[in-house]
């Protein structure tokens, strides 16, 4: 699977309009696009939102680059600055709850972005130290991670903020260990908030992995 994550900073006072644009324009325009697996958008702050598109492959995403650029041009009315865009093939992840196509399921998303010194060591840390915490957690829906050059982007979606916070305490303990913190060049940035719009175009089954 191929992921594209878009993180704009919004002009003050435009957040509600931007969210409506995503729900009423972006989602309908891309629904039914060949190779598109899911669209997810969440609110991450007073003037920030985040959107993630999941594709079968980089090729299927690239085939829609013109439509993507047209959409970004239309959305520019809401942007205070050019958005950050991260993309890459999945290197980690798992489905923890089966979710049916077009199922409406509330979610709370946590996405962490950081520049890593050693990609292999960072991926091993996800598998060896983070995944066991995921496996023991309650309310977890799905996890994933990509690399965009030397930047690691990892995420998890939960049933509720409470479920996420419970697991986040354990995840932060792992991150605070010196050896784990040394994996990053600087402190990672976390974007956290409720999912306000989502569309799933295939069935996801518990235990499946995007890798």
Tell where the protein language model's regions lie, with residue ranges.
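Short S/T/G/P-rich N-terminal loop/turn motif that feeds into the first structured element of a domain
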Residues: 1-50, 56-211
